[in-house]
Amino acid sequence: MIWKKNIIAGFNITTIGDDRNYSYIPTRYGNTLADKVSKHILQDIDYVEYSFLDRGRDERQYCSHGVGLPIATICRTKYGEYPEYHTSLDDLTVISPSGLYGGYEKIKKAIELLEKNDYYKVTVLCEPQLGKRGLYPTISTKTSAATVRVMMDFITYADGDNDLIDIANIIGVQAEDLFEIVDKLKAVKLIKVI
């Protein structure tokens, strides 16, 4: 199947516009890149993780035997879990601009993370000297030590065995907080994508 060969991760986006909880339904086994991205972008908020057994029609099709696409579901309140669902009250009053915007922001983060989630490897042995590469701050501020620490922690785990999400999870930051660090390290050729 051509889809399976060409899709590395996808998201079923449904019921995304209300102001209630966020929800996530994994792929059949919950071990795909789509699952990893979904859990990472939702980890900083209160969300409900459902079992694949709580799936709906779309999940049944995308993840069925023989199809097995790596597509996870991200939504606000899961279909069937809000009182207005499939009643005459299930209308545009259920959604809101802030709910839609919040849903949009999460999906945007998921796509950005998919695009930037690579395996990185440091190009030098041992801990690199940051100062001669212009990566060490020349003025000490309240945040400069923490910034250097995150960069050094990233470098420690950029061994080619961990992707960006793995590293972010290991060092306890959001992957998006590493985007700028990755760009800086790539610019001075301290890391490479493998």
Locations of regions flagged by a protein language model:
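Helical lid/core segments from catalytic subdomains that handle acyl or acyl-like groups
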Residues: 40-45
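Active-site-adjacent mobile loop/cap segments within catalytic or ligand-binding domains
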Residues: 56-118, 165
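Long, charge-rich, low-complexity alpha-helical segments
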Residues: 146-194
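Acidic/histidine-rich catalytic neighborhood of metal-dependent amide-processing enzymes
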Residues: 1-35, 47-64
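Acidic, low-complexity/disordered tracts enriched in E/D and polar residues
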Residues: 89, 93-156, 182
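Hydrophobic alpha-helical transmembrane segments of membrane proteins
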Residues: 35-38, 68
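Generic recognition of stable, solvent-exposed alpha-helical segments in well-folded globular domains
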Residues: 33-36, 57, 98-106, 149, ...
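Short acidic (Asp/Glu) and glycine-rich catalytic loops that position anionic groups and cofactors
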Residues: 14-20, 81-90, 132-133, 161
